[in-house]
């Protein structure tokens, strides 16, 4: 049986995704909550969203690191 490919989502990427997309915080608010800049949140969101989209479109598992 073939093993399902995995994509690793970092804890900070997951937290940024949760705060902005589920909790409806702005990137600036999420940055304050996480102790990072708005730009860092924006970067984490871009990376996380691409990883999730890739995993969903290719049937890959998402693992959290």
Sequence positions of predicted segments:
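Helix-turn-helix DNA-binding motif, specifically the short coil turn and the N-cap/start of the second
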Residues: 26, 35-40
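Short alpha-helical "packing" element that flanks the helix-turn-helix/winged-helix DNA-binding module
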Residues: 16-17
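Residues within the DNA-recognition helix of helix-turn-helix
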Residues: 44-47
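Short amphipathic helical patch at the helix-1/turn junction of helix-turn-helix
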Residues: 20-22
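Alpha-helical residues within the helix-turn-helix
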Residues: 32
């Amino acid at each position: 049986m073939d093993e399902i490919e995995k994509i690793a989502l970092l804890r900070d990427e997951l937290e940024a995704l949760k705060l902005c997309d589920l909790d409806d915080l702005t990137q600036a608010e999420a940055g304050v909550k996480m102790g990072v800049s708005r730009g860092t949140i924006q970067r984490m969101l871009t990376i996380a969203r691409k990883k999730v989209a890739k995993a969903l479109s290719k049937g890959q598992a998402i693992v959290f690191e």
